[in-house]
């Protein structure tokens, strides 16, 4: 029988999710969930400056996106985030190329992010987009500095 905690999991309730995964994986084959919070709510982007402040003392933020447009109404969500972050931080925006309209998680893309982190002297990386952008940012920050948020 499948664990109901996993079928109907609230992704914001990380403690319950961690315990359900631990119970379902006695051999510890799955990677642990290391994030401390997940925000799924209206106006979540407005929380970004405060979240960054909690995790980084620095003022240099590398914002990484792909070329896929996201909108809130008629406004570009990525541009809104960039503007919002620029009010409190020095922001460099790296746009990854969607080869053939699809971004792939390949070493080449991770290296681009790593190079941007080093060249800009980023204190924090914010990935905006889907799972591929997020995975690439995690891989790149891990390669540069395990403690970089």
Predicted regions and their residues:
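ATP/NTP phosphate-donor binding region
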Residues: 2-124
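Glycine/threonine-rich beta-strand-loop-alpha-helix active-site module
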Residues: 105-149
């Amino acid at each position: 029988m499948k664990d109901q905690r996993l079928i109907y999991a609230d992704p914001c309730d990380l403690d319950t999710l961690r315990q359900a995964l631990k119970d379902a994986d006695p051999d510890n084959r799955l990677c642990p969930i290391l994030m401390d919070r997940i925000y799924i709510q209206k106006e979540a982007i407005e929380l970004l400056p405060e979240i960054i402040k909690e995790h980084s003392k620095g003022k240099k933020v590398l914002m990484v996106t792909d070329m896929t447009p996201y909108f809130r109404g008629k406004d570009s969500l990525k541009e809104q985030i960039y503007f919002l972050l620029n009010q409190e931080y020095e922001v460099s925006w790296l746009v990854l190329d969607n080869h053939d309209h699809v971004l792939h998680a390949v070493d080449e893309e991770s290296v681009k992010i790593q190079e941007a982190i080093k060249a800009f002297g980023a204190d924090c990386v914010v990935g905006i987009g889907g799972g591929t952008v997020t995975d690439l940012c995690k891989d790149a920050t891990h390669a540069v500095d395990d403690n970089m948020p």
